[in-house]
Curated annotation (Swiss-Prot):
Keyword RNA-binding set for record: no
Name recorded for this polypeptide: Sodium-coupled neutral amino acid transporter 7
Organism this protein belongs to: Bos taurus
Annotated membrane topology: Multi-pass membrane protein
Subunit record text: Interacts with the mTORC1 complex; this interaction mediates the recruitment of mTORC1 to the lysosome and its subsequent activation.
Segments crossing the lipid bilayer: 56-76, 82-102, 130-150, 179-199, 206-226, 240-260, 283-303, 320-340, 372-392, 396-416, 429-449
Length: 463
């Protein structure tokens, strides 16, 4: 096997080990990785973690499944029906799995343990900064989507509890959507977001898994045994245009994006080997595919092209089984928002400390003031935007393009740089194939990012 000469000296990339940029981000709630030491064995050696292969599959599935599930029936409608939606997901799955394997390979080569650290080490300073900015933006947008989801589910629950018709007009002020979102956010989300450390991640992980599987089960059951008042609208059989198919890309990328948290999972395994990891992510993505397809197909066929961007909004408020699903989603989002905010705040903190040239070991008072200020600004901005953005589809259409960067662009760049760093005088055909595949990933990811972002700006946000 060719020797890989990826530079592991942080100074050569213009980094400083005391500037905070090495913060661990988006680590899975179930992953526990000991800090690296100077003489530690690289991943794949005897210094592996404690996670079994089966445990790694569960963690990756958990990282993959989330709030994007609610938008999949609408994505099938956008793509042009069941056949187009299935074809698009199956085609994307190949690239999604390969991106996860590439990240594991580059993690071994660079001896780094988180997504952004791998990008920093393999691709250099500029790409590393872009990656961190993308992570911060992505987590910010996801927090907005979480608040919108809370408002969506609360509207339906309050309509039943207050025994009043849904929609504007005639409702008491305390049932107003903006008031209920703000009250919930200030009472629950803000206090959970301020602490320096997050110790409840395992509970959020459990709630997310239970809520996701329950929502999927309810949607499938409601399709098989529909209520009398639920009649589907037009069922599309083909896409209106090829552009319509690509408009479903953001939801798929947002739904399957687990790449940022995959690197810590890989390094937490007892035997962190690329071959074993390939089996782990293949099994995990097949499970996630089954969940997303079940939700997307049954939700779309139940409501047709009239399905809401949040599929649970399409069901009657009085349906108790769906009401339980809404409660699960709210609880899951309430605990997931602080985790995503923590990840985004860690990136911003690292960028700020690096820019200022400040050491991590500063006095506690300054760190606390800066943390509270960062949290308040983040919280208020996401809340303000969530109050005026009507549905999660518009948010996902924007951050889905960033998810494509995590799935395609950064892994592609890492693969190219890793292969270019191999010290071989004669490049075999496999070397050229890998470089070409990396170029394909970058090109495809850049196209998806550009097309979906432009569409989101000119069609969704400016409409």
């Amino acid at each position: 096997m060719a020797q890989v000469s990826i530079n592991r000296d942080l100074g050569e990339w213009g980094l400083s080990t005391d500037s905070g940029e090495r913060a661990r981000l988006l680590q899975s709630p179930s992953v526990d990785i000991a800090p690296k030491s100077e003489g530690e064995a690289p991943p794949g050696g005897v210094g592996g973690g404690t996670t079994s292969t089966l445990g790694a599959i569960f963690i990756v599935v958990n990282a993959c499944l989330g709030a994007g599930l609610l938008n999949f029936p609408a994505a099938f409608s956008t793509a042009g029906g069941v056949a187009a939606g299935i074809t698009l997901q199956m085609a994307m799955l190949v690239f999604i799995i390969s991106g996860l394997v590439i990240l594991a390979y580059c993690s071994q080569a660079s001896n780094e343990r988180t997504y952004q650290e791998v990008v920093w080490a393999v691709c250099g300073k500029l790409t590393g900064v872009l990656c961190e900015v993308a992570i911060a933006t992505y987590t910010f947008g996801t927090c907005i989507a979480f608040l919108i989801i809370i408002g969506d589910q609360q509207d339906k629950i309050i309509a039943v509890m207050a025994k009043e018709p849904e929609g504007p007009g005639g409702s008491p002020w305390y049932t107003d959507r903006k008031f209920t979102i703000s009250l919930t956010a200030f009472l629950f989300i803000l206090p959970l977001s301020i602490p320096r450390e997050i110790g409840f991640q395992k509970y959020a992980s459990f709630l997310s898994v239970v809520g996701t599987w329950y929502v999927t089960a309810i949607i499938i059951i409601k399709y098989i045994w529909p209520d009398k008042e639920m009649t589907p609208a037009d069922i599309l059989n083909r896409p209106a245009s090829w552009i319509a198919v690509f408009n479903a890309m953001p939801t798929i990328c947002f739904g399957f994006q687990c790449h940022v948290s995959s690197v810590p999972v890989f390094n937490s395994m007892r035997q962190p080997e690329v071959k074993t990891w390939g089996g782990v992510v293949t099994a995990a993505m097949v499970i996630a595919l089954a969940v997303y397809m079940g939700t997307g197909i049954c939700g779309f066929l139940t409501f047709g092209d009239a399905v809401d961007p949040d599929v649970l909004l399409s069901y009657p408020s009085e349906d108790m089984a769906v009401a339980v699903a809404r409660a699960f989603i709210i609880l899951s989002v309430l605990t997931s928002y602080p985790i995503l905010h923590f990840c985004g705040r860690a990136v911003i903190e690292g960028l700020w400390l690096r820019y200022q040239g400040m050491p991590v070991e500063e006095d506690v008072g300054r760190e606390r003031r800066r943390r509270v200020l960062q949290t308040l600004v983040w919280f208020l901005l996401t809340l303000l935007l969530a109050l005026f953005i009507p549905d999660i589809g518009k948010v996902i259409s924007v951050i889905g393009g960033l998810a494509a960067c995590f799935i395609f662009v950064f892994p592609g760049l890492c693969l190219i740089q890793a292969k270019l760093s191999e010290m071989e005088e004669v490049k075999p055909a496999s070397w050229w194939a890998m470089v070409s595949y990396g170029v394909l990933l970058v090109t495809l990811g850049a196209f998806i990012f550009g097309q979906t972002t432009a569409n989101a700006i000119f069609v969704d946000l400016l409409a």
